[in-house]
Structure formats: C-alpha cells, structure tokens
C-alpha cells in the first residue's frame, strides 16, 4: 500500500501518488464552522406545477415529501458518494419554491457543521435527491421534467474561506 499524498501533481486530493483512490486524511485540519448552500431546479409543464401547488397529485404533497427526501439525502451522502467522510451535520435545511413564471420548482439546500471537512457534497446531494423526488412523484403526469442547474452557490469555513458562485 502506498502512502497517501496531500494532492497529486494536478491538485487532485482523492488519489495517492500511485493513482489509487483514497479518502482524504483530514485529521490534521482545524475544526471550523462550515456552511454550504447549493441550488437547482426541476423544470416542468405548467399543468404539472399547478398540480404541485394545488396538491392535486395522487402521490401526495410533493414539496413536503421532496423536502424530507432532500434532508435524508444530505444525511446519507457518504453512503452515495464513495469517498465522502461521514459527517455530524448540525443543520440541513431544504427549501422548494414553486416558480410559476418559469414553470419550475427552485430547490435550495443549506448544510452546516463544525468540523474538519466541508459540507458541499451534502448540500449538493440534498438538492439532487429533492429534485429526483419531485420527478418521481410527478412522472405519471409529466415524463419530460428536467433537473437543471444543480450547483454549489456558496461555502464558508475551512482554509479556503468563503466562496460564492458568480
């Protein structure tokens, strides 16, 4: 077994010097408050969005179920993304907002903790799982929905400090 390197020559941290996948050793990092916010959208037909808003779908309250699914997704991130550390999240908030002007549901997730590694993947996973849940609950009436624009919006904490998407 080879010793893990801090990063490969091209800056990748999840590979050792021999190119093997490794979980990054964060034991030497300082614990700091870390927050990440991610966002995304589910685009759909106007009638589908109307049915969501009016709670007229057979599977129930789409926004509430998707909100819970997003929270659960954030908590299960290390089970889904192979090299993510299990984290003691102190906050997971998922908001789903209907946007009738653009026939979509806008999803925002905020994750926080005090720890040695960031929560970006947890926030992104929360958005993706919430979006997939919207799709699952509405696919009987609209198979053409699209999950779009899933991305990190901001992060704070750690040695890289604050970052905000432009």
From Swiss-Prot:
Its EC number is 4.6.1.17. The active site is at residue 136. SUPFAM superfamilies: Molybdenum cofactor biosynthesis protein C, MoaC (SSF55040). It catalyses: (8S)-3',8-cyclo-7,8-dihydroguanosine 5'-triphosphate = cyclic pyranopterin phosphate + diphosphate. It is an enzyme of class 4 (lyase). Keywords: Lyase, Molybdenum cofactor biosynthesis. Disulfide bonds: none annotated. It comes from the Bacteria. GO terms for molecular function: cyclic pyranopterin monophosphate synthase activity. InterPro entries: MoaC (IPR023045), MoaC_bact/euk (IPR047594), MoaC_sf (IPR036522), MoCo_biosynth_MoaA/MoaC (IPR050105), Mopterin_CF_biosynth-C_dom (IPR002820). Pathway: Cofactor biosynthesis; molybdopterin biosynthesis. Substrate binds at residues 83-85, 121-122. GO terms for biological process: Mo-molybdopterin cofactor biosynthetic process. It holds the Pfam family MoaC. Gene3D superfamilies: Molybdopterin cofactor biosynthesis C (MoaC) domain. Belongs to the MoaC family. Homohexamer; trimer of dimers. Catalyzes the conversion of (8S)-3',8-cyclo-7,8-dihydroguanosine 5'-triphosphate to cyclic pyranopterin monophosphate (cPMP). This is Cyclic pyranopterin monophosphate synthase. It comes from Rhodospirillum rubrum (strain ATCC 11170 / ATH 1.1.1 / DSM 467 / LMG 4362 / NCIMB 8255 / S1).
């Amino acid at each position: 077994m080879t010793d893990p390197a801090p990063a490969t020559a091209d800056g990748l941290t999840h590979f050792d010097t021999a190119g093997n996948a490794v979980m990054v050793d964060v034991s030497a990092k300082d614990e700091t408050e870390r927050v990440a916010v991610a966002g995304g959208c589910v685009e759909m037909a106007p009638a589908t969005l109307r049915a969501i808003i009016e709670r007229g779908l057979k599977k129930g309250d789409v926004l509430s179920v998707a909100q819970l699914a997003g929270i659960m997704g954030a908590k299960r991130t290390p089970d889904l993304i192979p090299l993510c550390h299990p984290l003691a999240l102190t906050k997971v908030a998922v908001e789903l907002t209907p946007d009738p002007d653009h026939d979509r549901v806008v999803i925002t997730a905020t994750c926080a903790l005090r720890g040695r590694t960031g929560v970006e993947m947890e926030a992104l996973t929360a958005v993706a799982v919430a979006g997939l849940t919207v799709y699952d609950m509405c696919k009987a009436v609209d198979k053409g929905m699209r999950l779009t624009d899933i991305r990190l919006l901001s992060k704070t904490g750690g040695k890289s400090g604050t970052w905000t998407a432009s």
